[in-house]
Structure formats: C-alpha cells, structure tokens
From Swiss-Prot:
<keyword id="KW-0963">Cytoplasm</keyword>
<keyword id="KW-0677">Repeat</keyword>
<keyword id="KW-0175">Coiled coil</keyword>
<comment type="function">
    <text>Actin-bundling protein. When linked to F-actin the actin filaments form preferentially anti-parallel bundles that associate into meshworks. Plays a major role in cytokinesis.</text>
</comment>
<dbReference type="InterPro" id="IPR001715">
    <property type="entry name" value="CH_dom"/>
</dbReference>
<feature type="domain" description="Calponin-homology (CH) 2">
    <location>
        <begin position="124"/>
        <end position="229"/>
    </location>
</feature>
<dbReference type="GO" id="GO:0005737">
    <property type="term" value="C:cytoplasm"/>
</dbReference>
<keyword id="KW-0206">Cytoskeleton</keyword>
<dbReference type="GO" id="GO:0005856">
    <property type="term" value="C:cytoskeleton"/>
</dbReference>
<dbReference type="GO" id="GO:0003779">
    <property type="term" value="F:actin binding"/>
</dbReference>
<keyword id="KW-0009">Actin-binding</keyword>
<feature type="coiled-coil region">
    <location>
        <begin position="227"/>
        <end position="355"/>
    </location>
</feature>
<comment type="similarity">
    <text>Belongs to the cortexillin family.</text>
</comment>
<dbReference type="InterPro" id="IPR015383">
    <property type="entry name" value="Cortexillin-I_coiled-coil"/>
</dbReference>
<protein>
    <recommendedName>
        <fullName>Cortexillin-1</fullName>
    </recommendedName>
</protein>
<dbReference type="InterPro" id="IPR036872">
    <property type="entry name" value="CH_dom_sf"/>
</dbReference>
<feature type="domain" description="Calponin-homology (CH) 1">
    <location>
        <begin position="8"/>
        <end position="115"/>
    </location>
</feature>
Length: 440
C-alpha cells in the first residue's frame, strides 16, 4: 500500500472515530488535519476518551496563531501529565500548520491506547487479543482459519464471516464461498458498512494482493471488534430499556390505580386520623388509669408492708408478753405458795399466840398466887423483915416489856424457889434436930 493510500485509510478511520467520540458533546470534524488546529476540539476529544476533566483555562474561540498554539500546548501537556501518554516528534505548531502525517501518527498513538490496547480475549490483549477474538468469533465457518493479519484476510472469507456472524439475516455465507476473493472482500466491506457501521477503508484488490500494510488491517479489523462490543452494549441498553419500560408501565398502572383510589385513600386517611385521635385519647385515658392503678398498688403495697411490720412487731410483743406472762404466772404461783405459807405461819402463830396468851394468863395467875405465897412465906421469914417483897417486884418489872417482865418474874421465882427450898431444908434440919433433942 502506498503512503498516500495509507493516509486515506487512516484519515477515514480516525475521522469516524473522533466524530463518534465528539458526538457526545454535539461536535464533529470533517478534516482531521484542519479541524483540530485550534486545539479546542482536541481538548474536548481528550477529555471524552480519558474520562478526565481538563482543568486548565483555555481560549474557546482562538483567532490568532499564538492563541491556537497555547491551546494545543495545554492539550499536549494534559496528554503527558494527566494521561501519562508521551507522543514523540509532534508539537503544537504541527497542528496549526496542518501537518497531516504528524497528526495521523498522533491519532494512531491514541487509537492504539484507547481502541486496540483495551482489546482482550483470553490471555491475549492488543493486536494478539484482536487476532484471537477474530479466530474465536469465526470458529465453525468453512475455509476460515485466522492466524495472522497479513495472510488470513486476503481471501475475504474472514471478513465475510465476521459480517455474517454479526447479523446472519443479511446474507447466506455459503452463497459466497465459491466466489473469487475480490468479490468476497467487496461483499464483506459492503455488509460491514451496512450492518456494522464499519466504513470501507480498504481496497479489495490491495488486500487480496497482500499490499495493504498490517497497521491498516489492524485498524480496520479493530472496527469490527468495537462494532460487536457496541452491539452488545446496545443489547444491554435495550434490555435495560425494556426492563425500565416494564417498570414504568407497572408504575403507570400503579399511578392510575392510585389515582382511581385517591378519594378512597383520602377518606381512609381521614378515618385513620379520626381513629388515631380516638386511639390516642384512649391511650391517654388508659395511661392515666394505669398511673392511678400503679399509685394505688404502691399504696396497697406500702400498707401491706406497714401491716407486715406491725404484725411482726405485734408477734414480737406477744412473744414477749407470753414470756412475761409465764414469768408472772411463775411468780404468782410462788407468791401464792408464799401466801399460803405465810397464812399457815400466821395461823400457827395465832394459835401459838392464843395458847401462849392462855398459858401466860395461867402463868400470871400462878405467879400471882405464887407471889402471894411468897409474900406469905416472906412474912414468915425472919431474914426478910426490912421491906415488902411485892413492892420490890413491882418496882423491878414496872419499866420492862411484858415478855421481859415474865422472864424477870420467872428468874425471881426460881431464885425464890431456891431460897424457899433452902429455907425448908433448913427448917427440916432444925426440926430434925429439935426432935432429936426432944427424944433424948
């Protein structure tokens, strides 16, 4: 492939790619060499493919060359500092001067990073991953055996199989197996453009002859990979959209049902409010009743506790009283015994006193008689002529108590008896002596 042809292939491919990205911001280009020269759309493009915000201030409508160069310099610094992509041999002036070769090389570097390096199949990535993806996607198609970019795609069967696998309703693959390679390649490019949206970048004759360089083949084939991925993403979005539509339909039905029952709900709401107010009133009354009941229970428990303590105190006092009663009963029994003993003693003393009184009376009588006898004897006695006996006795006992008087009189009587006995004995002796003398 001549250098001019390669530029055409790249220009078509990169224009389509850049426009697919810029479309998200409502922008587009028609000439990659001219439309990126002021740096504005290049900055937008770099933001979109990287997902990073361009934070530097730049001129959105540069008129002078210096302003364009400043924008482009900021874009290249963003590419190197933020996106960590080093691009050799190109400067801001190359964009301003519309250096197509340098610009295409720049875009190829970006394309490899963001469109080829991201391809992954099995344990392979980049170009090898793309080749393995082609092999796996075309498995089962007659005559297709993907081994390399430079040899596999020359007969057109591989591209035709990729186009057919994407949408089998477009054509019958078997109808093209017997056609010549150029016819198959042209058919594949046509179906790829119609069915996959892959622009016709290659010439069938050059591909069949093997003069198309490998980079062009890689670039064109990568468009198939991304078309498949876009289809898968679209199917996922459609599934999500369908699911969302179902949910929206369900929500709409729910809203309609809710709309129909709105008045009923309002009525129920009012009824519930009334019921809630009633329940709140009942709850307040019930709470008040429970508080009063709790207070009464506390009072009852307090009274029961007081009664229990009083009962315990009463039981303690009764126990003490029973002990005191037993002691008193014992003391009473002892007192009664003592009383009986004293009464018996008093009775005995009374009887004894009566007997003693009677005896004393008799004794007094005997004493009086005896005193009379003594007096008589005294009168007879010669020794006692100086004073009378009774006056002496009366004088001696007049100041003494009765008992002492008795003792004193008894003593006197005993002394007198002894004196009388002695006197009688003396008289008897005298009488005996006189009798003896008279007998002589």
């Amino acid at each position: 492939m001549a250098g001019k042809d390669w530029e055409i292939v790249q220009e078509k491919a990169f224009t389509a790619w850049v426009n697919s990205v810029l479309d998200k911001r409502g922008e587009k280009i028609s000439d990659v060499a001219k439309d990126l020269s002021d740096g504005v759309k290049l900055i937008f493009f770099l933001e979109l493919i990287s997902g990073k915000k361009f934070n530097k201030k730049f001129d959105y409508e540069p008129k002078a060359r210096i302003n364009m160069i400043q924008n482009l310099a900021l874009a290249l610094h963003f590419l190197e500092d933020e996106l960590k992509i080093k691009v050799q041999g190109i400067g801001a002036e190359d964009f301003v001067d519309n250096n197509k070769k340098m610009i295409l090389g720049f875009l190829w570097t970006l394309y490899r990073k963001y469109r080829i390096a991201v391809i992954s199949e099995g344990d392979k990535s980049s170009e090898e991953g793309l080749l393995l993806w082609c092999k796996n996607t075309t498995t089962g198609y007659n005559g297709v055996n993907v081994t390399s970019f430079t040899k596999t795609f020359r007969d057109g069967l591989a591209y035709l199989a990729l186009a057919h696998k994407f949408d089998q309703s477009q054509f019958n693959f078997a109808d093209y197996e017997k056609l010549d390679p150029i016819a198959r390649l042209n058919a594949a490019f046509e179906y790829a453009e119609k069915g996959l949206g892959v622009p016709k970048l290659l010439e069938a004759e050059e591909v069949m002859r093997g003069t198309t360089d490998e980079r062009s083949l890689v670039l064109y084939t990568s468009l198939f990979f991304h078309a498949y991925r876009a289809k898968e993403e679209k199917e996922r979005l459609e599934a999500s959209k369908s699911d969302l539509a179902s949910k929206l339909a369900g929500l709409q039905n729910s809203l309609e049902s809710e709309k129909l029952s709105r008045e009923q709900l309002i009525k129920q709401k009012d009824e519930l409010k009334s019921l809630l107010a009633s329940l709140e009133g009942e709850a307040a009354e019930r709470e008040k009743f429970l508080r009063e009941l709790e207070a009464k229970l506390e009072e009852i428990l307090k009274n029961l506790e007081l009664e229990r303590l009083a009962r315990m105190e009463l039981e303690s006092r009764l126990s003490k009283m029973e002990k005191d009663k037993a002691i008193l009963e014992l003391k009473l029994a002892e007192a009664q015994d003592e009383k009986a003993r004293l009464e018996a003693q008093i009775e005995a003393d009374r009887i004894r006193s009566a007997a003693e009184a009677q005896s004393l009376g008799l004794l007094r009588k005997h004493l009086d008689q005896h005193v009379q006898d003594l007096i008589k004897w005294q009168k007879l006695s010669i020794e006692n002529s100086s004073s009378t006996f009774d006056d002496q006795i009366i004088e001696e006992v007049s100041g003494l108590p009765f008992g002492e008087q008795v003792k004193h009189l008894a003593t006197k009587l005993e002394d007198e008896n002894k004196a009388i006995q002695k006197l009688l004995l003396s008289k008897e002796d005298d009488l005996k002596t006189a009798k003896k003398k008279a007998g002589k």
